[in-house]
Amino acid sequence: MNFKYIIAVSFFIASAYARRNEKDVQSLSQRDVLEEESLREIRGIGGVLLSAGKAALKGLAKVLAEKYANGKRTAEDHEVMKRLEAVMRDLDSLDHPEEASERETRGFNQEEIANLFTKKEKRILGPVLGLVGNALGGLIKKIG
């Protein structure tokens, strides 16, 4: 009788241990799924914010380009217009990165491609902020 009791208790302990391990594995996989879902949500929100920022920059660049295109331009205004056109091309290439990267990277090796994209990011953000500041400063001077 004692032997049957020992076997039954051992079986009960082993099955309880197995169930606990199974639940731990399930909770880990559920946690991974939840983390992945939250990462997708964060990426979605980031994508929406990036799209809104790009749209705002494009709109501002178009307004500034129209302003400079309709009036008489000095050499400085002409230079600003050229920069705005370059910014517009860069912003358009952000909307269609595959096409832009195919055009820009033909004949480059992988290291040059990585350097090109790093330079492109710097080339877009720096001048955009500078141009927006200069254009707004120029508009304020002309209005005031």
From Swiss-Prot:
Pfam families attached to this UniProt entry: Bombinin (PF05298)
UniProt KW keywords: Amidation, Amphibian defense peptide, Antibiotic, Antimicrobial, Cleavage on pair of basic residues, Cytolysis, Fungicide, Hemolysis, Secreted, Signal
Positions of modified residues (Asparagine amide): 70
Lineage: superkingdom: Eukaryota
Function per UniProt: Maximin-4 shows antibacterial activity against both Gram-positive and Gram-negative bacteria. It also shows antimicrobial activity against the fungus C.albicans, but not against A.flavus nor P.uticale. It has little hemolytic activity. It does not possess a significant cytotoxicity against tumor cell lines. It does not possess a significant anti-HIV activity.
Record organism: Bombina maxima (Giant fire-bellied toad)
Sequence positions bearing Isoleucine amide: 143
Tissue occurrence: Expressed by the skin glands.
Signal sequence segment: 1-18
Predominant localisation class: secreted
Similarity-based family: Belongs to the bombinin family.
Disulfide pattern: none
GO biological process, one term: killing of cells of another organism
Record localization: Secreted
Stated name of the protein: Maximins 4/H3 type 2
Cross-referenced InterPro entries: Bombinin
Pro-piece positions: 19-43, 74-123
GO CC annotation, single: extracellular region
